[in-house]
From Swiss-Prot:
Keyword Ribonucleoprotein (UniProt): yes
Any one GO biological process: translation
Entry's Gene Ontology molecular function annotations: structural constituent of ribosome
Domain of life from the UniProt record: Bacteria
InterPro entries with a match to the protein in the record: Ribosomal_bS16, Ribosomal_bS16_dom_sf
Lineage: Bacteria, Bacillati, Bacillota, Bacilli, Lactobacillales
Keyword Ribosomal protein in annotation: yes
Keyword terms: Ribonucleoprotein, Ribosomal protein
Similarity comment: Belongs to the bacterial ribosomal protein bS16 family.
Protein name: Small ribosomal subunit protein bS16
GO CC annotation, single: cytoplasm
Length: 90
């Protein structure tokens, strides 16, 4: 079972709202997920991003792979640098 951290679309037509979830890679985009670890609202100004950093950090250490978009959001929040430091600067 490959676990991914990815976006789960919610909201109305033309008003997207994304939950950042941990899900099995075989599940559909808006299908079942294991845990919700944050959300992203690209419509609001400024764009709203809420992350549960502890849960995301735990999942990344367990081997969960973020999607490209989620990786970009995590890098902007500084989580990928934190993971890199924890992994290589013991």
């Amino acid at each position: 079972m490959s676990v991914k951290i990815r976006m789960h679309r919610a909201g109305a037509k033309r008003k997207p709202f994304y939950r950042i979830v941990v899900a099995d890679s075989r599940m559909p985009r808006d299908g079942r997920f294991i845990e919700q670890v944050g959300y992203y609202n690209p419509v609001s100004q400024p764009k709203e991003l809420k992350l549960d950093e502890d849960k995301i950090f735990d999942w990344l250490q367990k081997g969960a792979q973020p999607s490209d978009t989620v990786r970009s959001l995590l890098s902007g929040a500084g989580l990928m640098t934190k993971l890199h430091d924890a992994k290589y600067n013991k």
